Amino acid sequence: MPTSTPFRPRSIAAVLAAVAVLVLPACGSGGQRGPTGEPSTHHAPHWDYDAEGPDHWADLDRDFLTCKSGHQQSPVDLPGHARLEPHEHTTVDYHSVPTVTLRNNGHTVQANLPTHNGNRIVVDDVPFELVQFHFHLPSEHTVDGVGTTMEVHFVHKSATGQVAVLGVLLRAAPGPSGFAPILSVAPRAVDVETVVPGPIDLRSMLPGATDQYRYQGSLTTPPCSEGVSWTVLGSPVAVAPADADRYRALFSHSNRPTQPLNGRSVTLAGG
Protein backbone atom coordinates (compact mmCIF):
# COMPACT_ATOMS: atom_id res chain seq x y z
CA MET A 1 0.00 0.00 0.00
CA PRO A 2 1.50 3.40 -0.88
CA THR A 3 2.55 5.67 1.94
CA SER A 4 -0.23 8.12 2.62
CA THR A 5 0.16 11.83 3.08
CA PRO A 6 0.15 12.74 6.80
CA PHE A 7 -3.03 14.29 8.08
CA ARG A 8 -2.94 18.06 8.16
CA PRO A 9 -4.68 19.66 11.17
CA ARG A 10 -7.08 21.64 9.01
CA SER A 11 -7.90 18.59 6.90
CA ILE A 12 -8.74 16.32 9.82
CA ALA A 13 -10.82 19.06 11.43
CA ALA A 14 -12.79 19.42 8.22
CA VAL A 15 -13.30 15.67 7.98
CA LEU A 16 -14.55 15.55 11.57
CA ALA A 17 -16.90 18.45 10.92
CA ALA A 18 -18.29 16.74 7.84
CA VAL A 19 -18.82 13.46 9.67
CA ALA A 20 -20.49 15.32 12.56
CA VAL A 21 -22.97 16.83 10.12
CA LEU A 22 -23.56 13.43 8.52
CA VAL A 23 -24.46 11.75 11.81
CA LEU A 24 -26.58 14.55 13.30
CA PRO A 25 -29.88 12.92 12.29
CA ALA A 26 -28.86 9.63 13.88
CA CYS A 27 -27.73 11.33 17.07
CA GLY A 28 -30.90 13.40 17.34
CA SER A 29 -28.92 16.59 17.88
CA GLY A 30 -30.32 19.93 16.88
CA GLY A 31 -28.56 22.87 15.28
CA GLN A 32 -25.29 23.01 13.40
CA ARG A 33 -22.18 22.14 15.39
CA GLY A 34 -18.47 22.32 14.80
CA PRO A 35 -15.91 19.51 15.14
CA THR A 36 -15.73 19.91 18.93
CA GLY A 37 -19.51 19.65 19.34
CA GLU A 38 -19.89 23.34 20.15
CA PRO A 39 -22.55 25.32 18.23
CA SER A 40 -21.10 26.64 14.98
CA THR A 41 -21.71 30.21 13.85
CA HIS A 42 -20.68 29.35 10.30
CA HIS A 43 -23.40 27.91 8.09
CA ALA A 44 -22.25 26.16 4.95
CA PRO A 45 -23.89 27.49 1.78
CA HIS A 46 -26.15 25.57 -0.55
CA TRP A 47 -24.40 23.35 -3.06
CA ASP A 48 -25.67 20.88 -5.62
CA TYR A 49 -24.69 19.02 -8.77
CA ASP A 50 -26.04 21.59 -11.24
CA ALA A 51 -25.60 25.39 -11.24
CA GLU A 52 -23.74 25.22 -7.93
CA GLY A 53 -22.12 21.94 -8.85
CA PRO A 54 -18.62 20.45 -8.58
CA ASP A 55 -16.95 23.03 -10.85
CA HIS A 56 -18.13 25.81 -8.51
CA TRP A 57 -17.95 24.23 -5.04
CA ALA A 58 -14.67 25.94 -4.18
CA ASP A 59 -16.21 29.33 -5.01
CA LEU A 60 -19.15 28.91 -2.63
CA ASP A 61 -17.36 28.93 0.72
CA ARG A 62 -13.86 29.24 2.15
CA ASP A 63 -14.22 25.81 3.74
CA PHE A 64 -14.76 24.30 0.28
CA LEU A 65 -11.43 25.47 -1.19
CA THR A 66 -9.95 21.97 -0.99
CA CYS A 67 -12.47 20.91 -3.64
CA LYS A 68 -10.28 22.87 -6.09
CA SER A 69 -6.84 23.06 -4.46
CA GLY A 70 -6.60 19.50 -3.12
CA HIS A 71 -4.20 17.01 -4.69
CA GLN A 72 -5.72 13.80 -3.28
CA GLN A 73 -9.32 14.19 -4.36
CA SER A 74 -12.02 11.58 -4.93
CA PRO A 75 -13.53 9.92 -6.86
CA VAL A 76 -10.96 8.63 -9.34
CA ASP A 77 -10.82 6.40 -12.38
CA LEU A 78 -9.52 3.09 -11.07
CA PRO A 79 -6.99 1.40 -13.36
CA GLY A 80 -7.79 -2.21 -14.13
CA HIS A 81 -4.03 -2.88 -14.21
CA ALA A 82 -3.52 -1.67 -10.62
CA ARG A 83 -0.64 -3.20 -8.68
CA LEU A 84 -1.70 -6.49 -7.10
CA GLU A 85 -1.09 -6.63 -3.34
CA PRO A 86 -3.36 -9.35 -1.90
CA HIS A 87 -2.07 -8.87 1.66
CA GLU A 88 -3.31 -5.24 1.67
CA HIS A 89 -6.87 -6.53 1.92
CA THR A 90 -9.45 -4.45 3.86
CA THR A 91 -11.46 -6.67 6.18
CA VAL A 92 -15.23 -6.13 5.97
CA ASP A 93 -17.11 -7.29 9.08
CA TYR A 94 -20.78 -6.62 8.36
CA HIS A 95 -23.87 -8.18 9.91
CA SER A 96 -27.54 -7.28 10.30
CA VAL A 97 -28.82 -4.09 11.92
CA PRO A 98 -32.19 -3.88 13.72
CA THR A 99 -33.16 -0.63 12.01
CA VAL A 100 -31.87 2.33 9.99
CA THR A 101 -33.11 5.90 9.72
CA LEU A 102 -33.42 7.14 6.14
CA ARG A 103 -33.07 10.82 5.35
CA ASN A 104 -33.40 12.77 2.14
CA ASN A 105 -30.78 15.46 2.73
CA GLY A 106 -31.29 17.21 -0.60
CA HIS A 107 -28.20 15.62 -2.14
CA THR A 108 -28.78 11.90 -1.66
CA VAL A 109 -30.69 9.29 0.31
CA GLN A 110 -28.72 8.57 3.47
CA ALA A 111 -29.20 5.69 5.90
CA ASN A 112 -27.99 6.48 9.42
CA LEU A 113 -27.14 3.58 11.71
CA PRO A 114 -27.36 3.35 15.50
CA THR A 115 -24.07 3.86 17.34
CA HIS A 116 -22.16 0.76 18.41
CA ASN A 117 -23.99 -1.26 15.75
CA GLY A 118 -21.18 -3.82 15.47
CA ASN A 119 -20.51 -3.30 11.75
CA ARG A 120 -17.00 -2.28 10.83
CA ILE A 121 -14.10 -2.51 8.44
CA VAL A 122 -10.45 -2.95 9.39
CA VAL A 123 -7.92 -0.96 7.36
CA ASP A 124 -4.23 -1.52 8.06
CA ASP A 125 -5.13 -3.06 11.44
CA VAL A 126 -7.25 -0.02 12.41
CA PRO A 127 -10.99 -0.68 13.05
CA PHE A 128 -13.53 1.78 11.64
CA GLU A 129 -17.18 1.69 12.78
CA LEU A 130 -19.93 2.06 10.18
CA VAL A 131 -21.79 5.35 10.67
CA GLN A 132 -23.98 5.69 7.59
CA PHE A 133 -24.33 4.80 3.94
CA HIS A 134 -25.65 6.81 1.01
CA PHE A 135 -26.03 6.65 -2.76
CA HIS A 136 -24.78 8.32 -5.93
CA LEU A 137 -26.17 8.08 -9.48
CA PRO A 138 -24.43 7.31 -11.74
CA SER A 139 -21.39 5.81 -10.03
CA GLU A 140 -18.65 8.21 -8.96
CA HIS A 141 -15.74 5.81 -9.37
CA THR A 142 -15.07 4.28 -12.76
CA VAL A 143 -12.84 1.36 -13.79
CA ASP A 144 -10.80 2.01 -16.93
CA GLY A 145 -13.22 4.83 -17.72
CA VAL A 146 -16.38 2.75 -17.39
CA GLY A 147 -18.96 3.55 -14.71
CA THR A 148 -22.04 1.76 -13.42
CA THR A 149 -25.67 2.63 -12.73
CA MET A 150 -25.13 3.71 -9.13
CA GLU A 151 -22.65 3.57 -6.26
CA VAL A 152 -23.17 3.23 -2.52
CA HIS A 153 -20.71 4.64 0.00
CA PHE A 154 -20.45 3.05 3.44
CA VAL A 155 -18.88 5.73 5.67
CA HIS A 156 -16.86 4.65 8.72
CA LYS A 157 -15.07 6.47 11.53
CA SER A 158 -12.22 5.26 13.75
CA ALA A 159 -11.83 5.89 17.47
CA THR A 160 -9.48 8.78 16.64
CA GLY A 161 -11.85 10.37 14.12
CA GLN A 162 -10.24 9.19 10.90
CA VAL A 163 -12.57 8.36 8.03
CA ALA A 164 -12.64 5.29 5.78
CA VAL A 165 -15.16 4.72 3.01
CA LEU A 166 -16.15 1.44 1.39
CA GLY A 167 -17.49 2.00 -2.12
CA VAL A 168 -19.71 -0.57 -3.83
CA LEU A 169 -20.58 -0.24 -7.52
CA LEU A 170 -24.20 -1.02 -8.43
CA ARG A 171 -25.41 -2.28 -11.80
CA ALA A 172 -29.09 -2.36 -12.73
CA ALA A 173 -30.20 -5.96 -13.22
CA PRO A 174 -33.41 -7.93 -12.69
CA GLY A 175 -33.80 -10.12 -9.64
CA PRO A 176 -33.61 -9.66 -5.87
CA SER A 177 -31.56 -6.82 -4.44
CA GLY A 178 -30.40 -6.09 -0.91
CA PHE A 179 -31.11 -2.41 -1.52
CA ALA A 180 -34.84 -2.83 -2.16
CA PRO A 181 -35.85 -2.34 1.53
CA ILE A 182 -34.02 1.01 1.48
CA LEU A 183 -34.64 2.50 -1.95
CA SER A 184 -38.28 1.43 -2.11
CA VAL A 185 -39.16 3.63 0.89
CA ALA A 186 -36.76 6.55 0.36
CA PRO A 187 -38.30 9.86 1.52
CA ARG A 188 -39.35 12.05 -1.40
CA ALA A 189 -39.26 15.36 0.48
CA VAL A 190 -36.05 17.04 1.61
CA ASP A 191 -35.18 16.79 5.32
CA VAL A 192 -37.81 14.12 5.85
CA GLU A 193 -36.81 11.00 7.78
CA THR A 194 -38.32 7.54 7.90
CA VAL A 195 -37.38 4.59 10.07
CA VAL A 196 -36.88 1.30 8.25
CA PRO A 197 -37.45 -1.67 10.56
CA GLY A 198 -35.11 -4.61 10.30
CA PRO A 199 -33.40 -6.79 10.49
CA ILE A 200 -31.47 -5.40 7.53
CA ASP A 201 -28.61 -7.64 6.42
CA LEU A 202 -25.79 -5.42 5.20
CA ARG A 203 -23.99 -8.44 3.77
CA SER A 204 -26.69 -8.65 1.09
CA MET A 205 -25.41 -5.31 -0.21
CA LEU A 206 -21.91 -6.65 -0.93
CA PRO A 207 -20.56 -8.74 -3.82
CA GLY A 208 -19.36 -12.28 -3.29
CA ALA A 209 -15.95 -11.55 -4.83
CA THR A 210 -13.29 -10.03 -2.59
CA ASP A 211 -11.21 -8.04 -5.09
CA GLN A 212 -10.91 -4.42 -4.02
CA TYR A 213 -9.14 -1.22 -5.02
CA ARG A 214 -7.44 0.85 -2.32
CA TYR A 215 -6.11 4.39 -2.42
CA GLN A 216 -5.91 7.59 -0.37
CA GLY A 217 -8.45 10.25 -1.26
CA SER A 218 -11.10 12.63 0.00
CA LEU A 219 -14.78 13.13 0.65
CA THR A 220 -16.57 13.38 -2.70
CA THR A 221 -18.83 16.20 -1.48
CA PRO A 222 -18.00 19.56 0.11
CA PRO A 223 -15.80 20.27 1.97
CA CYS A 224 -13.88 17.59 -0.03
CA SER A 225 -11.60 16.97 2.97
CA GLU A 226 -8.59 14.79 2.27
CA GLY A 227 -7.06 12.05 4.42
CA VAL A 228 -9.83 9.54 3.64
CA SER A 229 -8.91 5.88 3.20
CA TRP A 230 -10.83 4.44 0.25
CA THR A 231 -11.66 0.84 -0.54
CA VAL A 232 -13.77 0.24 -3.66
CA LEU A 233 -14.96 -3.30 -4.29
CA GLY A 234 -14.14 -4.43 -7.81
CA SER A 235 -17.26 -6.49 -8.57
CA PRO A 236 -20.59 -4.67 -9.03
CA VAL A 237 -23.71 -5.65 -7.09
CA ALA A 238 -27.16 -5.85 -8.66
CA VAL A 239 -29.74 -3.17 -7.99
CA ALA A 240 -33.29 -3.60 -9.27
CA PRO A 241 -34.03 -1.27 -12.23
CA ALA A 242 -37.20 -0.10 -10.46
CA ASP A 243 -35.20 0.90 -7.38
CA ALA A 244 -32.64 2.75 -9.49
CA ASP A 245 -35.51 4.57 -11.20
CA ARG A 246 -36.98 5.53 -7.81
CA TYR A 247 -33.68 7.09 -6.81
CA ARG A 248 -33.31 8.78 -10.21
CA ALA A 249 -36.73 10.37 -9.76
CA LEU A 250 -35.38 12.05 -6.61
CA PHE A 251 -31.87 12.86 -7.88
CA SER A 252 -31.40 12.72 -11.64
CA HIS A 253 -27.65 12.80 -11.10
CA SER A 254 -25.65 13.03 -7.90
CA ASN A 255 -22.06 12.23 -8.80
CA ARG A 256 -18.86 14.23 -8.76
CA PRO A 257 -16.66 13.70 -11.85
CA THR A 258 -13.47 11.69 -11.44
CA GLN A 259 -10.44 13.63 -10.22
CA PRO A 260 -6.75 13.36 -11.25
CA LEU A 261 -4.65 10.79 -9.41
CA ASN A 262 -1.74 13.25 -9.25
CA GLY A 263 0.79 10.47 -8.83
CA ARG A 264 -1.17 8.46 -6.27
CA SER A 265 -0.92 4.69 -6.40
CA VAL A 266 -3.98 2.44 -6.57
CA THR A 267 -3.59 -1.03 -5.11
CA LEU A 268 -5.66 -4.06 -6.11
CA ALA A 269 -6.03 -6.17 -2.98
CA GLY A 270 -7.86 -9.32 -2.07
CA GLY A 271 -7.90 -10.60 -5.63
Model-derived segments and spans:
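Alpha-carbonic anhydrase
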Residues: 2-271
